[in-house]
Amino acid sequence: MENRHGLVVNTRLTLATGTAEREAAVEMVPRRGQRRVTLGGDKNYDTQDLVKQLRQRRVTPHVAPNNTNRSRAVDGRTTRHAGYAVSPRKRKRGEEIFGWMKTIGLRRKVRHRGRELVAWMFTYTAAAYHLMRMGKLVGAKA
């Protein structure tokens, strides 16, 4: 999700494993570019491996703290900045996209079989959300 306007940037359907979501996130972030970008995520993203991979790609991890019986993977270099304080609100916007997909986009229950078809329908629903969001953004500026 793009933070400024809440638009879906990329989608990826993965098998339900404990690490698939993090692996897909690393694949979807851009390679080393000129500008530093951030990646927001929930507690699942607060791991040493993911933070290391993101920093190698010049991506700043803005992940929720996972304080259950271990130390944080993100250090004070990241958490002290004002942009990090904005990340929880942006993460909520990302969850709103999935809420829209489940209620309006009819993706609460998978109605198709086959990974390729389910992936296509997920991307199609994300595009529908994108169009709905674009309509609101254009209407707000008119």
Q: Where are the predicted features?
A:
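Helix-centered, glycine/charged polyanion-binding patches within enzymatic domains
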Residues: K43-W120
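A short, flexible helix-boundary coil/loop motif
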Residues: I104, R108-V110, G135-A142
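Polybasic low-complexity intrinsically disordered regions
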Residues: M1-Q53, T123, Y129, M134-L137
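Short, charged/polar low-complexity linear motifs in solvent-exposed/disordered segments
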Residues: V26-M28, R80, L117-V118, A127
